[in-house]
């Protein structure tokens, strides 16, 4: 499935009953969040609020509010098909040369997909049908949502921030929330290790005193949006990955006021700059943990130009205690992670990030254990292999007879196969999510690994328990007479 832009995707969703138009006037201040939250928790459709109170621009919410809609956005029919996306990423992360003619033939589809990686640069684009600049720039005319009662101000949530470091050819796309503080001012909340922040740091070192160009795209096509939240290899741009998902090159256009390239079909683009030293206190905001976060200082983004499509749609979301849209994205992207991990660690059978663990803070791994200490190796591998898991506080490792996605199984393994002193790994002074207020120091805390596998010689000196198994012949005999027994009739 190929979607040229967000509107193509919305047309498909509406045809499949996955989009609901809301014509009743609804306030972007708290009310849209209340409706979107109730709808998402019920597994409902994406919502297009056509008449937000006080605004002439519609608001799109819950676009990726079910795992299936995430899969559709990636060009797949269902969530299970996302494993194929993961296999492609695993191949791109560590490509292997063909071993012979047959292997070359088998790999041809992957090599063919790589041809769609370069971007296609356009001279003009839908996202520049209207250009607003100078004193006419007014972010207050966009229906930016206030999601929770104690939020500091309206908050942009789904903006794709485009940056480029002074020594880099490829651009970085990142999603960072942005607090509205003036008609042309936003606070760019990016953490120091994220791509945009690193580009900014390099720029300040190379061009002291000069303004750092930044652009933010809102309402891009689904492949580009999802490319920005998927674990693409560092050598692959998000635009290139979006081209792989879509099956056609990503169309981009040069910004009006800077040399950055943005998705040509985006609904809205904010162009501007960040100046070194211009900071502002950001927050508090309710976030994906279910709590309001601390106030901290981040750079100020000054918007000099707004370009947009005719009849532009504002794409937004809310974050709160799971389930929310980030948690749903986590469930779907979980399937992408599995093949990537399995390529590096073939012994891994399954990998699961429970949504109630705030998408990434707890992971359950099942594996085919082969030697003493093997579980701890896998544990350390999860923390170090992909940067997405450096904030995972808890890793539980079980044998392959345990269903990683069934808490009944996992808790049984923990309580029967673990000795707390022997099988618990504690690692101190590691990177922790800035939003994790439970850590003793902001951004620095500990991690815990739980080895809930059967223990091998060298790990225990005791005779290990043998799991109870039914006699299959008895089971077959009872199956034959079960209906006759009429126990539940």
Swiss-Prot record:
It is found in: Cell membrane. One of its GO terms (biological process) is ubiquinone biosynthetic process. The active site is at residue 287. One of its GO terms (cellular component) is plasma membrane. Keywords: Cell membrane, Decarboxylase, Flavoprotein, FMN, Lyase, Manganese, Membrane, Metal-binding, Ubiquinone biosynthesis. Gene3D superfamilies: Single helix bin (1.20.5.570), UbiD C-terminal domain-like (3.40.1670.10). Prenylated FMN binds at residues 175-177, 189-191, 194-195. It is a peripheral membrane protein. GO terms for molecular function: 3-octaprenyl-4-hydroxybenzoate carboxy-lyase activity; metal ion binding. InterPro entries: UbiD (IPR002830), UbiD-like_C (IPR049381), UbiD-like_N (IPR049383), UbiD_bacteria (IPR023677), UbiD_Rift_dom (IPR048304). Its EC number is 4.1.1.98. Coiled coil: none annotated. Its cofactor is prenylated FMN; Mn(2+). It catalyses: a 4-hydroxy-3-(all-trans-polyprenyl)benzoate + H(+) = a 2-(all-trans-polyprenyl)phenol + CO2. Mn(2+) binds at residues 172, 238. Pathway: Cofactor biosynthesis; ubiquinone biosynthesis. Pfam families: UbiD (PF01977), UbiD_C (PF20696), UbiD_N (PF20695). Binds 1 prenylated FMN per subunit. Catalyzes the decarboxylation of 3-octaprenyl-4-hydroxy benzoate to 2-octaprenylphenol, an intermediate step in ubiquinone biosynthesis. HAMAP family: UbiD. Homohexamer. Belongs to the UbiD family. This is 3-octaprenyl-4-hydroxybenzoate carboxy-lyase. It comes from Klebsiella pneumoniae (strain 342). The gene is ubiD.
